[in-house]
């Protein structure tokens, strides 16, 4: 049992700042300004200039993906593609018997070349092992020739396929992601997830909303994350959102919620130039992005999920996708009104006035 003395931010409805917090084996047993007699001989930690706050909640995380990336190579701090190539070269040397490697964090905006590392550059430092370098936004990747040769038959006809640079976007990226996730063993995934949880807890995160269904066969990651969450004994909380447009994926696993990105993504993202826009992009590429589904499909999904009593989340970054999400949720709630539905739209980087009005009127 430990007593913390100092500034304790409770973050309750009144924003109360208490002077004492007592915890016993991870459970808070007292919070207040006067320390009760039974706790006066408890070991005390003086906070001094520090402040005790509740654990943070990460409300949108792809846990299986984050765990995999966390165990791989992080290139986010690289200032050039030459530096990334050198990091990959060293990573290959330390990879042992692994046949497939993963790196994360490539960005054309943080390197002096102003572009993503290319397939040719990856081939020079990693010719004999498959490698996928995931872009910082998680919506695209660059693969080397070894991996391209393995997947060419599956990705060459898909949207977002760029053989010359090795960059994969849209459906081509999803196919690459599916291959990578299915190359992981259950034991390896479990170890990676435990390491990722420990890492997040060490940075003050105590709860995550994980959006699962990132390409594992049979949506294994959804089931696995649910089981993994129940196995945690340190108070860390996990809320699982299955990324599926099939309501049964949630209901069969007795999950009260559904949605996220991947299959529930209505569009892409700005970094990959595929966020769906009401007006065309004004750069040289032009276009208005990618809207993955028509209204009919999204509305049908929302109606089924809402009638099943599920909480719904959908990815919408561009304003065109945001409007579509709002229309679909409105149609679902008009069809079957619910007071405490807790439906939400993820990201919504460019909300429109019309969409905001729907959100306000329907408590989205």
Residue positions per predicted region:
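Acidic (Asp/Glu)-rich catalytic clusters
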Residues: 231, 251-255, 338, 359-361
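Long, K/E/R/D-enriched contiguous segments that form extended
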Residues: 267, 301-311, 319-324, 350, ...
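Non-cysteine beta-strand/loop elements that form the S-adenosyl-L-methionine
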Residues: 62, 257-274, 363-364
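Divalent metal-binding segments
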Residues: 2-4, 9, 13-24, 28-234, ...
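Glycine-enriched alpha-helix->loop->beta-strand junction motifs that scaffold or abut catalytic
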Residues: 255-259, 330-332, 358-364
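Conserved helix-loop functional segments at active or binding sites
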Residues: 304, 328-335
């Amino acid at each position: 049992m430990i007593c913390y003395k100092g500034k304790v931010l409770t973050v309750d409805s009144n924003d109360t700042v208490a002077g004492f917090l007592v915890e016993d084996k991870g459970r808070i047993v007292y919070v207040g300004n006067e320390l009760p007699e039974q706790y006066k001989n408890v070991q005390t930690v003086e906070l001094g200039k520090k402040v005790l706050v509740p654990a943070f909640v990460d409300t949108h995380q792809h846990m299986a993906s984050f765990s995999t990336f966390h165990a791989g190579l992080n290139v986010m701090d690289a200032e050039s593609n030459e530096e990334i190539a050198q990091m990959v070269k060293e990573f290959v040397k330390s990879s042992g018997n692994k046949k497939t490697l993963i790196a994360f964090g490539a960005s054309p905006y943080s390197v002096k070349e102003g572009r993503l590392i290319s397939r040719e550059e990856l081939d020079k430092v990693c010719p004999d092992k498959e490698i996928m370098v995931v872009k910082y936004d998680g919506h695209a990747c660059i693969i080397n020739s070894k991996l391209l040769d393995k997947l060419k038959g599956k990705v060459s006809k898909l949207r977002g396929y760029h053989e010359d640079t090795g960059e994969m976007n849209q459906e081509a990226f999803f196919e690459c992601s599916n291959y990578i996730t299915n190359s992981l063993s259950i034991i390896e995934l479990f170890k990676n997830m435990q390491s990722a949880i420990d890492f997040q807890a060490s940075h003050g995160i105590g709860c995550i909303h994980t959006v699962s269904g990132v390409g594992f066969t049979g949506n294994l990651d959804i089931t696995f994350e649910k089981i993994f969450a129940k196995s945690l004994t340190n108070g860390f909380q996990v809320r699982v959102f299955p990324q599926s447009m099939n309501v049964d994926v949630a209901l069969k696993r007795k999950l009260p919620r559904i949605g996220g990105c991947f299959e529930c993504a209505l569009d892409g993202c700005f970094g990959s130039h595929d966020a769906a826009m009401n007006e065309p992009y004004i750069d040289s590429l032009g276009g208005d992005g990618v809207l993955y589904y028509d209204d009919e499909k999204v509305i049908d999904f929302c109606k089924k999920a809402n009638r099943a009593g599920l909480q719904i989340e959908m990815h919408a970054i561009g304003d065109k996708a945001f409007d579509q999400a709002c229309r679909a949720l409105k149609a679902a709630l008009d069809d079957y009104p619910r007071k405490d539905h807790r439906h939400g739209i993820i990201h919504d980087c460019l909300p429109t006035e019309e969409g905001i009005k729907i959100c306000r009127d329907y408590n989205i």
